[in-house]
Amino acid sequence: MSLAHTAAEYMLSDALLPDRRGSRLKGLRLELPLDKMVKFITVGFPLLLMSLAFAQEFSSGSPISCFSPSNFSVRQAAYVDSSCWDSLAHHTQDKAGQYKVKSLWPHKALPYSLLALAVAMYLPVLLWQYVAVPSLSSDLLFIISELDKSYNRSIRLVQHMLQIRQSSSDPHVFWDELEKARKERYFEFPLLERYLECKQRSHWLVATYLLRNALLLLFTSATYLYLGQFHLDVFFQDEFNCFIKTGLLHDETHVPELITCRLTSLSVFQIVSVSSAAIYTILVPVIIYNLTRLCRWDKGLLSIYEMLPAFDLLSRKMLGCPINDLNVILLFLRANISELISFSWLSVLSVLKDTTTQKHNIDTVVDFMTFVAGLEPSKPKHLTQHTYDEHA
């Protein structure tokens, strides 16, 4: 065995990918980075604000401070604070002497509305987790495994052809094998490509992904509506007139009907309202961008794997409308690019292929690795002429 042949064998052996069977499921990312960011913000931010509201309530005591008359006892003053917080309504008297009541309940419901918002924003996450993730994880495991196996099969094919070249005394045998490998499919059943074609006709994952983002937009719109309808109406009101002629003070003739109370938690209410509107306004373009990514193919990823035999979705123009499950899977393949060991190898080979002087004879990884192993990528002219003379 020659030194060059040994070096080529070592080089091809090093190019083979290790078997990572069983360890990939834990490392798979089943949420896109932007989706994960949106999840943490839409769910975590309301919970953070809810904690702020509860902390302010516990630290400052009563969220309102009523200006009770000086002749009130401690018991009566405590009753006024409790009664006004329970009713939390602003009373004004019109010219006819009738009371107009304006409810200030958004102040009281603030922590619970934030909790409801966090729960609502978590529903799209649960939808994706239980409806799409089981199917997506199996798809990714199979496709990643098959892509790496296809790369390994290509390298083993080059090893086999190198052995044929070294063991055969007739160079025509090697070139016949090489031409046959170029013209025919390397697999009797191109399972991966047919599986990807099947996913191109499926719309389960993409429908779930669209529904997830549509629900996020719907709940965000509901948040805007809630803030505009209820919070804006009481946003600047720091005082209110409370009707106290009830319960303990109902029969007290010397007690006024209305007293003034001040909302001590108004600043927290305003901070929560403004920050919620600002954060969700920022997130809307992110959600829309996530949806627009479904309108285009990741041809950069596909073009790299065009170097594999029997993987020609691009060259055969098999890509149609991008709104299907295959496009969603490609987005997650890009997010799990660290799990695709073959991608880094093929990326390097693709760059090197573009710099070689014999591009017309190098189409797949088999052609390039054959060339790197020290073999001619095409039949030498003297052998071609010899074959032509024999047929003549």
UniProtKB/Swiss-Prot annotation:
Protein name as catalogued: Pannexin-3
The UniProt record lists the keyword Ion transport: yes
Pfam families hit by this protein: Innexin
Topological domain spans for side Cytoplasmic: 1-39, 135-215, 289-392
Post-translational events: N-glycosylation may play a role in cell surface targeting.
Reactions performed catalytically: Ca(2+)(in) = Ca(2+)(out); ATP(in) = ATP(out)
Gene Ontology cellular-component terms listed: endoplasmic reticulum membrane; gap junction; plasma membrane
MF terms (GO), sorted A to Z: calcium channel activity; gap junction hemi-channel activity; structural molecule activity
UniProt superkingdom: Eukaryota
TM ranges: 40-60, 114-134, 216-236, 268-288
Topology versus the membrane: Multi-pass membrane protein
Main localization of the protein described in the UniProt heading: membrane
Tissue distribution: Expressed in skin, cartilage, heart, lung, liver, spleen, thymus and kidney. Not expressed in brain. Expressed in calvarial cells.
Sorted UniProt keywords: Cell membrane, Endoplasmic reticulum, Glycoprotein, Ion channel, Ion transport, Membrane, Transmembrane, Transmembrane helix, Transport
Cell compartment(s), UniProt: Cell membrane; Endoplasmic reticulum membrane
Residues exposed to the Extracellular side: 61-113, 237-267
InterPro entries: Innexin, Pannexin
Similarity remark: Belongs to the pannexin family.
Presence of the UniProt keyword Ligase in the record: no
Subunit structure of this chain's protein: Homoheptameric.
Carbohydrate attachment residues: N71
